A protein has these predicted regions:
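Glycine-rich, proline-tolerant flexible connector loops at the mouths of alpha/beta enzymes
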Residues: 50-54, 77-93, 163-164
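Histidine-acidic metal/acid-base catalytic patches
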Residues: 1-39, 49-50, 165, 178-184, ...
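N-terminal small/glycine-rich loop or linker at the start of catalytic domains
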Residues: 31-50, 111-125, 157-163
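Active-site acidic/histidine proton-transfer and metal-coordination neighborhood
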Residues: 13, 17-27, 104-105, 117-223, ...
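Active-site beta-loop-alpha junctions enriched in small/polar residues
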Residues: 38-40, 82-86, 110-115, 158-160, ...
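Acidic (Asp/Glu)-rich catalytic clusters
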Residues: 24-30, 60-75, 87-110, 142-149, ...
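Conserved, mostly hydrophobic/aromatic
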Residues: 35, 66, 98, 134, ...
């Protein structure tokens, strides 16, 4: 059965459920997912970097690849930059180059984890000189954001300690607040600071921004334009991420997402590949917040993945599509029935209401949306048939690989 016939069957079913199909399609067309520049370049683990033929080696090449994802999905028009990985001499020119590809430059991510000086921390380092270096880098990123037209500084710190007694918890907290206050004061309106947390790695005893409560505390101390960024891979196993999302929405402090998936830790697997039901439940809370007039939501939806074994552009297309699927399913939830079941204390019916939406095959719906947008209905198939991969392999070649360990 072709997608058109499958869509007719699905549309009839959804109409019978009382779904406003035009509204759902409109929401899907308006969905936006930002992709990361670093997701198009070679990456790996501390054990090995497996290089890929044709992988992007310059910022311009990363943007070229991101434009392919936008070309075949239609909802990924912005690209996050990582500084200094994406540092260039002329950001006005980079912005114009991106615009020429149909893209905009998105969140600016300071790198506060690779310099040798940051062994004991960056913004929390006990040495004031090194803290100054880290703060100055963040201030540089604010200037870069101004030049690129970005209104987001996305901040993740690797800062923490590995052993008891290594440093003062309260001393590091105070140093971090002092640094963040200087950064926040330098950010012009409406630029936002998104504070990302992670419960461990690379620090193993404690992490200075280890959980959502800590990130929220700092955001509340700074001001309304400081918010929390939720990375799906940055939680202990079993964490109820959708509850965290709901609480942050209710406090008007959910600033952004880094979509990815995990089996054990910060695995950076393709979003939706391991636990698609969790992703659906997260989108359920996001839609619930969007429908609440008492909540002011301005959420940056971003992917944060390093594709070590999958082809990078295909993996990114797959990731965007998986976000579309989760969002589409969540849009189909009968919210009136859900609320009635909750009020009646009917736990089974409440859960079944969610499952009815989750179990719906929304691929024909997404095919119809893409057709309306003038896109191919099968993004990965269309990309594979385009010849782009073969073209960049011939033009770019393959970089040399490396190991995470010396002399290996």
């Amino acid at each position: 059965m072709g997608w058109q016939k499958a869509y007719e069957v699905l549309a009839e079913d959804l109409a019978g459920r009382g779904v406003d199909i035009a509204s759902v399609k409109g929401s899907l067309k308006a969905q936006r997912i930002e992709t990361p520049s670093w997701g198009y370049a070679d990456s790996g683990t501390r054990f090995k970097v497996f290089t890929q033929p044709g992988a992007a080696q310059t910022t311009e090449q990363k943007l070229q690849d991101a434009a392919q994802v936008q070309k075949y999905t239609g909802i990924a028009p912005s690209v996050a930059l990582h500084i200094p990985w994406d540092k260039v001499d002329d950001y006005d020119a980079l912005r114009e180059y991106a615009e020429g590809l149909g893209l905009t430059l998105g969140a600016i991510n300071p790198n506060l984890f690779q310099d040798d000086e940051y062994k004991l921390g960056s913004l929390t380092h006990p040495n004031a000189k090194i803290r100054r270096q880290a703060i100055d880098h963040c201030l540089e990123c604010v200037e870069i954001a101004k030049a690129t037209g970005s209104d987001i500084i996305s901040l993740w710190l690797a800062d923490g300690t590995n052993y008891p007694g290594q440093d003062s918890f309260r001393g590091r907290k105070r140093r971090l607040l002092e640094a963040l206050e200087e950064l926040y004061a330098a950010m012009p309106e409406p630029m936002r600071l998104l504070i990302e947390y992670k419960f461990f790695e690379p620090a193993f005893y404690h992490t200075d921004l280890g959980d959502w409560g800590t990130a929220l505390m700092f955001a509340q101390k700074l001001g309304e334009r400081a918010q929390v960024l939720v990375d799906l891979g940055h939680h202990p196993l079993g964490t109820n991420i959708e509850q965290i999302v709901a609480y942050l929405i209710d406090e008007n402090r959910l600033g952004g997402f880094h979509f990815n998936s995990k089996k054990f830790a910060d695995d950076d697997l393709t979003v939706g590949s391991i636990n698609p039901y969790e992703l659906f439940l997260i989108f359920n809370e996001l839609i619930d917040g969007e429908l609440d007039p008492s909540v002011d939501m301005d959420v940056a939806y971003m992917i944060d993945q390093s594709h070590n074994v999958k082809p990078k552009i295909e993996a990114m297309i797959q990731s965007v599509v998986n976000c579309q699927v989760a969002y589409a399913r969540a849009l189909l939830i009968d919210r009136e029935a859900l609320q009635n079941a909750r009020l009646a204390g009917d736990i089974v019916l409440a859960e079944e209401t969610l499952l009815n939406a989750f179990r719906t095959d929304v691929r024909p719906l997404l095919a119809a949306v893409r057709s309306d947008m003038g896109l191919d209905v099968d993004p990965i198939k269309a990309y594979r048939a385009s010849g782009y991969y073969e073209k960049v392999v011939a033009e770019r070649g393959q970089a040399s690989g490396s190991s995470g360990y010396p002399e290996a």
